[in-house]
């Protein structure tokens, strides 16, 4: 059993690293740090990088354990932690933690999750599994019946739960699509950063619903043509585009998982900057939503696995 007062938890994705100093008993976060994403670090540099980032914590506290989720456990990370297959009780992740090489303390990496998606293809996640586990702990009603969860981000995850077990999920590339189109296409070219325009976002959501029979690929250029026709201010073009993409994401996922979502709200797990957009879109589409804080749930999920792995 780990007798230290604190341990280090890390959510280490491709682009960013978030480190948490966590109380071993309560699971409360005492401090945070950030660092480079795993794509910016060589695997053999990771132990020294963590030592530098965590040095103040290590000097002040008796810390002998760290645990990580995300792309740190991929083939481009510190060590390949593999995947566990669905259907999956996420508590079983604690039995398959991976120990990376050359660690400066006892360290473990949480595996990812793999499934056959509703379209029949293989799909995978890394990092989101801890948020889902945290959501189940925070909202015990997820242990009973069928529920649909949405975890927005660069690659959104739509997750079907049945009695607290992950049955399947599917990925939508909404975040990456929006980023690519706003940075590398003519659709929003010339638009300057401005305050969020709620009405034009809603217009995009409604348009995505009105033209539900039309493929999204045939709607996207309206972001440009509406500007040329005087129907859409250039400064609001990104908000209209966001509404189109998010609206269609919600509609498509709810169609795929129509039997999962019966009589239940969609749980949106993300930072408020994203979850608020999905909730607003859901309001326009008559899709009820509940928003949960992604970072809080990630810490809760990691802490649950920490306690299981250390027999607390």
Question: What is each PLM-predicted segment?
Answer:
Residues 16, 262-281:
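Glycine-rich phosphate-binding loops at beta-strand->alpha-helix junctions
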Residues 57-122, 163:
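Short beta-strand-loop/turn "lid" adjacent to the catalytic site in phosphate-handling enzymes
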């Amino acid at each position: 059993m780990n007798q230290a007062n604190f341990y280090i938890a890390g959510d280490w994705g491709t682009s960013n690293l978030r480190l948490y100093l966590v109380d071993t008993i309560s699971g409360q976060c005492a401090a945070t740090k950030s660092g480079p994403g795993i794509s910016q670090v060589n695997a053999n540099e990771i132990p020294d990088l963590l030592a530098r980032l965590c040095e103040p914590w290590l000097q002040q506290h008796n810390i002998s354990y760290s645990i990580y989720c995300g792309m740190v456990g991929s083939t481009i990370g510190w060590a390949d932690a593999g995947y566990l297959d669905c259907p999956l009780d996420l508590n079983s992740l604690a039995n398959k933690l991976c120990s990376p090489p050359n660690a400066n303390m006892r360290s473990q990496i949480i595996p990812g999750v793999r499934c056959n998606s509703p379209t029949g293809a293989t799909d995978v996640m890394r990092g989101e599994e801890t948020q889902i586990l945290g959501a189940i702990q925070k909202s015990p009603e997820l242990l009973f019946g069928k529920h649909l969860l949405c975890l927005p981000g660069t690659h959104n995850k739509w997750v079907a739960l049945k009695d607290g077990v992950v049955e399947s999920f599917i990925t939508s590339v909404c975040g990456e699509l929006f980023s690519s189109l706003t940075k590398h296409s003519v659709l929003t070219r010339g638009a300057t950063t401005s305050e969020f325009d709620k009405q034009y976002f809603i217009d995009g959501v409604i348009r995505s619903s009105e033209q539900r029979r039309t493929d999204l690929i045939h709607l996207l250029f309206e972001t440009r043509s509406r500007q040329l026709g005087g129907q859409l201010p250039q400064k609001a073009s990104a908000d209209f585009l966001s509404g189109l993409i998010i609206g269609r994401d919600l509609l498509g996922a709810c169609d795929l998982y129509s039997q999962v979502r019966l009589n239940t709200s969609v749980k949106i797990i993300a930072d408020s900057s994203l979850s608020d957009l999905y909730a607003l879109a859901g309001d326009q589409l008559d899709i009820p939503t509940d928003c949960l804080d992604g970072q809080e749930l990630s810490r809760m999920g990691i802490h649950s696995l920490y306690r299981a792995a250390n027999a607390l």
